[in-house]
């Protein structure tokens, strides 16, 4: 007899082994039809996996987040089924679930085209209509190897070879197609009707550019058509907001092949960058940070001592001169320790907070580069706090408050905070990890906000907190971080004199709020769709004349605005005023001032906004006060962006 406890506390008894599907059928046929999988004692399982002991069981349906993820994973297998039917010579690699969808990496001698993707999607729909059952079989290792050898699936064999301890594998059978997976998966293809293939890209086997290139097909899948439609609308809106398109349209920046992953900032984009830097400089100064500047090219010996040369060399740009090897710094931390080491510090000097707008370079694979979001050359709002163990909690709590306040200034009020704890491979004692993790957890608790654990995701040297922003499209961007590191200061001989007059190694807190300026500006462009808040707008005001007679008056107004610290330009072209207003609206300039004969005669200006609102006639002084108030609001009032 197997006793099954349901979420409401009721108990159902079954003679012998049972399954999640049988439990669902005992509750009702409607629930059984909706059953995607189950959770047995908290563990996700397939609907037909045997349950041989008393257990707590939850039914997973498409209404659950887990259910949607399972649908997406099964769609990846369905994609594999369709691809192998259409193109039997290709080799299947991996097909995981990702945010809002799935992908499959495939090795093919012939590059896939949009026409191929359309054919694959059509075949997937045809397979779904066949309404076949997805069969799971736990298969011995030798048999799995034989199956994939017969099918010529060399990448599956490599994956099996990566798991020498596995004696059996779960094989999922989609009719004649077989894929290997831990599961769970849907019991039948009827659950997979609401899907769409979305795009293709390149990828490398194991993510290494030295390996062969693969082709990646992305897709999305949902529980119902309404959710899919909403997702497609979000994707279409995201495409409109693509920072690369807007960057070109607003003359902010460009990238070119001669400098892959490096940004050519134009005057408009560089203005945004400078405003951001000046803002962060003031924030850090006001919160007790001292700003420093360290070299970009540093001798190999420092990177060897820090551990970067051994663990990170493939991501570093290197050079040599006079028989010495150097690296362009990929991060700032070892250099900051060198500054700390100049002169013996006392416990009275701690905490010592060092900030740098550090220019870093990382040799990212060319296939992974993506506008401002993934670059090779970038600047971080980087800082390191040298402190004692007892100071960790307060420093982290202060940093959390500061970080949330900064995000609020940019209009981000949905912040996700996660604490990444000790990984299996790590340095340091369990006691030091216990202390550091508790200090971070207590600091998070003191914020009064929700947060979650990410077990095993910490760095090898210490735990960390990650801050992710949710933008206006609901997308999540990981930006800020603070990491506890007792390891690097020790490797680089950092010491201070403690209260007992003994030498002690300080704790180093690595922290950033924005992450990289380049990526954060890309996020801002897409979040605002280019309609930057007044304080960030490259040009805040444009002054326009109706006829040539008002040209001098326009220039006088521009000069007055500039003296007040506003970013102002004039448009004195011999064009109709309506045309000029439309053009400057497309340039997203927040305020447009129009001067005709009446305004010149009265010494006033006619003010309208890029959203089309007419603010009427006012004096220049009144207008300056208005703009200063808007600047003070920063990004808390997101501009209307329905003028696309």
From Swiss-Prot:
Domain TGS positions: 1-61
* CDD domains the record matches: TGS_ThrRS, ThrRS_anticodon, ThrRS_core
> What protein is this chain from?
Threonine--tRNA ligase
The primary site where this protein sits is cytoplasm
Q: Which molecular-function annotations from GO does this UniProt entry contain?
A: ATP binding; metal ion binding; threonine-tRNA ligase activity; tRNA binding
Organism expressing this protein natively: Psychrobacter cryohalolentis (strain ATCC BAA-1226 / DSM 17306 / VKM B-2378 / K5)
The EC number(s) given in the record are 6.1.1.3
Return the similarity comment: Belongs to the class-II aminoacyl-tRNA synthetase family.
According to the record's subunit comment, the protein's assembly and interactions are:
Homodimer.
Q: GO terms for biological process?
A: threonyl-tRNA aminoacylation
For activity, the cofactor(s) needed are: Zn(2+)
- Residues where Zn(2+) binds: 333, 384, 510
Q: Which residues form the signal peptide?
A: none
Q: Where is this region: Catalytic?
A: 242-533
* Keyword hit for NAD: no
């Amino acid at each position: 007899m197997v006793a099954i406890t349901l979420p409401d506390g009721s108990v159902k008894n079954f003679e012998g082994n049972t399954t999640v599907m049988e439990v669902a059928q005992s509750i009702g046929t409607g629930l059984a039809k909706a059953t995607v999988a189950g959770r047995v004692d908290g563990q996700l399982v397939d609907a037909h996996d045997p349950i041989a002991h008393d257990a707590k069981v939850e039914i997973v349906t498409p209404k659950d987040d887990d259910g949607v993820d399972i649908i997406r994973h099964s769609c990846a297998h369905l994609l594999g089924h369709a691809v192998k039917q259409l193109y039997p010579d290709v080799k299947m690699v991996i097909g995981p679930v990702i945010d809002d969808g799935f992908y499959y990496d495939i090795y093919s001698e012939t590059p896939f085209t949009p026409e191929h993707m359309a054919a694959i999607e059509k075949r997937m729909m045809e397979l779904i209509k066949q309404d076949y059952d997805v069969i799971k079989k736990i298969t011995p290792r030798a048999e799995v190897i034989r199956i994939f050898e017969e099918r010529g699936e060399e990448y599956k064999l490599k994956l099996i070879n990566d798991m020498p301890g596995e004696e059996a594998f779960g094989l999922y059978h989609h009719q004649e197609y077989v894929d290997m997976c831990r599961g769970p998966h849907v019991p039948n293809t009827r659950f997979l009707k609401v899907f769409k293939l979305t795009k293709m890209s390149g990828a490398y086997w194991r993510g290494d550019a030295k390996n062969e290139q693969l082709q990646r097909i992305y897709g999305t899948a949902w529980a119902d058509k309404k959710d899919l439609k909403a997702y497609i609308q979000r994707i279409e809106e995201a495409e409109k907001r693509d920072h690369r398109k807007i960057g070109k349209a607003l003359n902010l920046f460009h990238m070119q092949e001669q400098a892959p992953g490096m940004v050519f900032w134009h005057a408009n984009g560089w203005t945004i960058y400078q405003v951001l830097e000046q803002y962060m400089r003031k924030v850090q100064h006001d919160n007790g940070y001292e700003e420093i500047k360290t070299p970009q090219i540093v001798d190999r010996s420092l990177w060897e001592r820090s551990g970067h040369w051994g663990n990170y060399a493939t991501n570093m740009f290197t050079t040599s001169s006079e028989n010495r090897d150097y690296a362009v710094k990929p991060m700032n931390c070892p250099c900051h320790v060198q500054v700390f080491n100049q002169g013996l510090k006392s416990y009275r000097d701690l905490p010592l907070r060092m900030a740098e707008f550090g220019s870093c370079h990382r040799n990212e694979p060319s296939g992974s580069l993506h506008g401002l979001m993934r670059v090779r050359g970038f600047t971080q709002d980087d800082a390191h706090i040298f402190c004692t163990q007892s100071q960790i909690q307060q420093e982290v709590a202060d940093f959390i408050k500061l970080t949330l306040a900064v995000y609020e200034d940019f209009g981000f009020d949905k912040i996700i905070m996660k604490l990444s704890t000790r990984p299996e491979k790590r340095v340091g004692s369990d006691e030091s990890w216990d202390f550091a993790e508790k200090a971070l957890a207590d600091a998070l608790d003191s914020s009064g906000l929700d947060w979650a654990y990410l077990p095993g995701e910490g760095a090898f040297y210490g735990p960390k907190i990650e801050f992710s922003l949710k933008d206006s499209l609901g997308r999540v961007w990981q930006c800020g971080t603070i990491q506890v590191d007792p390891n690097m200061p020790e490797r680089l001989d950092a010491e201070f004199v403690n209260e007992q007059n003994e030498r002690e190694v300080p704790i180093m807190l690595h922290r950033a709020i924005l992450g990289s300026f380049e990526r954060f500006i890309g996020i801002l462009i897409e979040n605002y769709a280019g309609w930057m808040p007044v304080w960030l707008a490259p040009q805040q005001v444009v002054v326009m004349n109706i006829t040539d007679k008002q040209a001098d008056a326009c220039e006088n107004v521009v000069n007055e605005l500039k003296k007040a610290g506003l970013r102002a330009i004039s448009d004195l072209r011999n064009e109709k005023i309506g045309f000029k207003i439309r053009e400057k609206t497309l340039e997203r300039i927040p305020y447009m001032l129009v001067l005709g004969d009446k305004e010149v005669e009265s010494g006033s200006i006619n003010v309208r906004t890029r959203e089309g609102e007419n603010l009427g006639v006012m004096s220049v002084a009144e207008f300056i006060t208005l703009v200063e108030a808007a600047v003070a609001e920063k990004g808390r009032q997101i501009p209307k962006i329905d003028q696309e």
